[in-house]
Amino acid sequence: MAKPTFKRQCYIKRHLRPLYRKHSRCSSINLGHGNYSLYINRVLKEVVPNRGISSYSVDIMNILINDIFERIATEACQQMFLRKRCTLTPGDIQQAVHLLLPKKLATLAVTFGSKAVHRFIHS
């Protein structure tokens, strides 16, 4: 039986497009964590137009948002496994939010989240 031969292609870096050279530009993409600094600034400008926020505060808010999302995802997966299902449903996520957040904040989060999903689907 003959050995399969693979062509090795050598590319010179200057001939590659800049998009392909910048693979490890942002380490948060590789870790699966989002960077919400742009959205934090947009919400701040919408709520208080003439105020700013330091980059250190934005980093703290970013860590807080990533932590909350991770906790919600973990709790929703536990709910999914408790019900012995393989599909994560919006009900699992809503129940995880109700378990993790205080009562009033959880109802507001579920309400606004449902509205946002509805607008996204029907736009």
From Swiss-Prot:
Belongs to the histone H2B family. The keyword ATP-binding does not apply. It is found in: Cytoplasm. May act as an acrosome-nuclear docking protein in sperm. The keyword Cytoplasm applies. It comes from Mus musculus. It holds the Pfam family Histone. Present in testis (at protein level). Not detected in other tissues tested. Its main location: cytoplasm. Keywords: Cytoplasm. CDD domains: HFD_H2B (cd22910). Gene3D superfamilies: Histone, subunit A (1.10.20.10). The lineage of its organism: Eukaryota, Metazoa, Chordata, Craniata, Vertebrata. GO terms for cellular component: cytoplasm; nucleoplasm; nucleosome; nucleus. InterPro entries: Histone-fold, Histone_H2A/H2B/H3, Histone_H2B. One of its GO terms (molecular function) is DNA binding. It comes from the Eukaryota. This is Histone H2B variant L1.
